[in-house]
Each structure stands twice: as C-alpha cells, then as structure tokens.
Amino acid sequence: MKKLLKSVLAFAVLGSASSLHALPVGNPAEPSLMIDGILWEGFGGDPCDPCTTWCDAISLRLGYYGDFVFDRVLKTDVNKQFEMGPVPTTTDTDAAADITTSTPRENPAYGKHMQDAEMFTNAAYMALNIWDRFDVFCTLGATSGYLKGNSASFNLVGLFGDGVANAANAIATVAADSLPNVSLSQAVVELYTDTAFAWSVGARAALWECGCATLGASFQYAQSKPKVEELNVLCNAAQFTINKPKGYVGKEFPLALTAGTDSATDTKDASIDYHEWQASLALSYRLNMFTPYIGVKWSRASFDADTIRIAQPKLAEAILDVTTWNPTIAGAGTIADGTGAAATANGLADTLQIVSLQLNKMKSRKSCGLAIGTTIVDADKYAVTVETRLIDERAAHVNAQFRF
C-alpha cells in the first residue's frame, strides 16, 4: 500500500509538470515539515503535559509567496434582459424609425464565457504555527491582472441609423434622448489592471498522520481591488483604446451627451473588486527531503466592477464634421451628406454613434479544481513548495519560507 501511494503521488507530480486566480492549495503536511528554527530549536511537546507552555507550542515562519494564474475559467454574472433601443428592422432604410424608446432585449452578455483571465501575485508570507500541526497564515503583496473576452460579454453597444437633424445649422447631431440600438458581438475587448495591494488569510491543519502520509485541510480568503490601467476595444465599427478609463456607475441609458469627452462629469475610475474563498483537502507522502502531494479544492471567485459604463472617447465639438474615428458604413445605400444647406436629416445614419460598453460582474464557471505539487525541505528549517492547479484554472504557485 505504501509503495502504491508513493507511486501515485510521484507520478502525479512529475506528470503534471508539462501541463501547467488565485489561491494555492499548499502542502497538507506543511505545519509539521519544518520542526526546527534558525534562531530557536523546535519543541515537540505534548499538549497534555502540564509543564508545557504556549511559548513551546508556537513558532513563526516567513517567506515569499508567488501565485501566477494563466487562465481562470470565468463567466459573466448578469441579468437575462438588457435595456436599450429597439432593434432596427427591414423597414428601416435611410434611418432607424425609433431611437428613443427603451426596450428590454435579450442580454447578449448572459452566460458568456471569458476567453482569457490572468492574475499574477507576489507577496510576503507569514505563518503562525501551533504544535507543529496547525497554521494560521496571511499574505501581503501586490497583484495585477488581464481580462479578454468577446465584446458581447461587455455589452458593447452603439447607435446606428440616427436620423435626427439640428435645424438651426443643418448639421446632423445626436439627440439627448437617443438610445443605442445595436449590439456589437463580432469584436474583442481586453483590459489590463494596474498593480494593486492584495491580501489573503487562511488556516491549514494536518488532520491525520500515518507513517509518512499526511491528510490535511485548509481554508483561505483573498481580496484585491486593482484599477483598470488600459482598455482596448478591437472592433471594425468602433475601435478605440482608453488609458485609465472612467465611467458611470448606476447610470441607465441614455448617457449624457458629454460622455466620452474631456468635459464629462460624475464619472469614476474603473476598478475591479476581486474576492475569492477556497476550501481544500489534500494528501501528502514524505520521501526524504521531498514531500509530494495531491489535493482537491472548492472555490468561488468574483470580479465586480459595479457594472461601470464606459463611453467611447470623442470630441465635444465636431472637427471636419467628425467626433470619432468610426468609419462610415453605406451598405446598399449611399453616404449621406450631413453638412451645408442641403444637409439631409440622416447625416449620422451611416456612422456608429454613442458607443459604450460596461464591465459586467464575473464569477467562477467551475467550482472544483485539482492541485498537484511537492515541497523540498532542507535541514528542517527551510522549505520550497511548487504547485500547479488544473480544471477550474491553469496556474502555478511558488512558496519559499523559513522557520525562526
């Protein structure tokens, strides 16, 4: 039985090395691996011994904590319906007939899967050990992230077929009550966050030991709130990039006409509130200085940006009859002229107007995952753990620590 257990754990660790946000499982035997310190000798006393004090039972470990998530499996967490303008129909030729009536439509972001979600964390690790069996630990450090998904996941919308004209100067303009009426799903949205403070707390216990085998459990909670550093929208009809984007929180359509301009007011910095909890159960087996382990975990992560709406950057006043770089799309018709005395009422009908997107809430698409790793212990004082996680995420973890 012992040979079988050794073979399974060794094969799992070696076989996973080629298959490589974010919480590691950790070695279940970690509380009892480092039994000696660099400053104070370890003490393996009996908790029932009346001569034993808490000073003998408690020890401290410090180290480096690095967690690198290459792909977290996420999906949007939104309502089934989305309020915007009516869908253009075949009867709309030169311009859309109705662009001011708010209509509940099927939400294109509902149940969408993110194409890529990455998170990289570097932190200091501190653990308080009790009786060489229990750990209470925390991490303090910094994290940064990257998200990429189909534009439908971000509710990228705009107004096409606007036929409102300004009679005073015969130049077509967008009315204050105009609503976006088309959803752009054949595009990609990606965002990068800045490096923000991150922390986590947790506890780990060696529940059962038999010879060199250890069964343990752990629970962890992590939190961070990075700001969005850069937002890229890769769309043929409306392509733009925003550095340090700002938007509207709790604002329904229509957005203010100043949205996207330098004079926009009541906007907030776009940030993502990340929360995650995780419970895990793992089994390890010590082979001299190596202690491989395998574990399962249950976790729930959420990324909430308060559904902030971010408008496409544009000029407050037209220059050369344009406010954005959005292309003119004539289709089967002709390009309308929106200037001069002979201006037509649909001068903006061939160009996408009032483009915006929103950062929807996201959550874990899968709750269960697998973790495989190994710990190398030297002189019972120093340890380095390497771990990989699969199924609900593709991630790697490195932890190096020493005991005082």
Swiss-Prot record:
Q: Which domain of life is it from?
A: Bacteria
Region entry Disordered, spans: 85-110
**Which UniProt key words apply to this protein?**
Cell outer membrane, Cell shape, Disulfide bond, Ion transport, Membrane, Porin, Signal, Transmembrane, Transmembrane beta strand, Transport
Residue spans of biased composition, Low complexity class? 89-103
The record's subcellular location field reads: Cell outer membrane
Quaternary structure and interacting proteins, as annotated: Part of a disulfide cross-linked outer membrane complex (COMC) composed of the major outer membrane porin (MOMP), the small cysteine-rich protein (OmcA) and the large cysteine-rich periplasmic protein (OmcB).
The record's similarity note reads: Belongs to the chlamydial porin (CP) (TC 1.B.2) family.
Q: What is this protein called?
A: Major outer membrane porin
Name the lineage.
Bacteria, Pseudomonadati, Chlamydiota, Chlamydiia, Chlamydiales
Q: Gene encoding this polypeptide? A: ompA
